[in-house]
């Protein structure tokens, strides 16, 4: 994961870290279409839940997109890639119970997202929004997406070995920790 920072936003390698099986299919199609650079598909071995029903997976072609939005204006945006998107979705349900309105953004490819128009980028991740990033990598890997008003929960050490549910609990990749981290972030 830490090596991905060497390539995020760069043209040297197209990196995809999809959130579920359907998003993986779109990323695989883009990998097969990409004839100009190597492509890295960063996949999980976990049994990850699918994104919410009705999701427009073709928007993954833009690198980042809204997978779930609040019914009215949001209080915070949660952004992640890969398996962490599922943790954000679960955490958003807990936040909703506290009347915190959440937008969830899946960002399978920051490099592709940065190639979109400024208008599209601002529509998905407005610069003045409070944005919380969740990553199983170094926090710096999402810093460019969360911006100056945001924060990232991530890891600074690697190499742990245990069943993924044990690691998620120990390292904080649970709905409960997303809830806690976001609540703390919103009162800063």
Q: Residue spans of the language-model regions?
A:
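Hydrophobic alpha-helical positions that pack around
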Residues: 29
């Amino acid at each position: 994961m830490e090596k991905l920072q060497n390539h995020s936003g760069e043209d040297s390698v197209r990196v995809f870290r999809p959130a579920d099986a359907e998003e993986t299919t779109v990323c695989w199609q883009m990998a097969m279409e990409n004839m100009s650079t190597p492509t890295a598909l960063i996949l999980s071995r976990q049994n990850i839940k699918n994104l919410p029903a009705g999701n427009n997976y073709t928007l993954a072609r833009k690198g980042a997109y809204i997978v779930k939005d609040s019914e009215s204006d949001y209080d915070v945006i949660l952004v992640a890639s890969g398996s962490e998107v599922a943790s954000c979705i679960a955490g958003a349900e807990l936040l909703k119970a506290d009347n915190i309105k959440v937008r969830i953004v899946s960002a399978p490819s920051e490099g592709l997202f940065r190639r979109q128009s400024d208008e599209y980028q601002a529509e998905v991740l407005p610069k003045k929004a409070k944005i919380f990033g969740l990553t199983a990598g170094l926090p710096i890997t999402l810093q460019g997406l969360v911006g100056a008003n945001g924060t990232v929960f991530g890891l600074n050490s690697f190499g742990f070995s245990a069943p993924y549910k044990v690691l998620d609990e120990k390292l904080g990749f649970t709905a409960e920790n997303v809830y806690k981290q976001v609540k703390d972030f919103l009162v800063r």
